[in-house]
Amino acid sequence: MSNSSINEILWTKHELISASKGKDLTTKFLNNKKIMGISIDTRSIEQNDLFIALKGKNFDGHDFLEKAIQKGASGVIVSRKDSALRYNGLFVKNTHAALINFAEFSRNRFKGKIIGITGSNGKTTTKDMAKIIFNEFGKTFATPGNNNNLIGLSLSLMKLPYN
């Protein structure tokens, strides 16, 4: 899910390269395009999203790069040099590690307050209620949906606006 509704640029080329220690092999990565959201799934990708080609047991995000570009991805993060060259992508050694590095970078640059909700039951409901309450006092960001694993948390942190 994209956070394009925030209407802010989420990442700059320099930040993505710095956080991932990636390489812009073609020097054309992003080419003045904006990153307004983050996606690892072409079924939900939106215009100006950054697509990260994760590899899993039953899938490889590199197989969906063409579709991501067709659907409006501004850029791609890849762990294959041939894909980086073909799609002007940012080449990283490991896209999973890059995702975690992006999350850490985003968390460190964020200057607002962060609240964590833990427990066995009711976390999503509590999070949704807290967001409604805190919205009354100012700008609020909450994890979209139910992203309670390492990939989901990392994606949520990557979507964290600057303020």
Question: What are the functions of these language-model segments?
Answer:
Residues H14-S20, A98-N163:
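Phosphate-binding loop of NTP-binding sites
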Residues M1-N101, F105:
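N-terminal leader/targeting and accessory segments in enzymes
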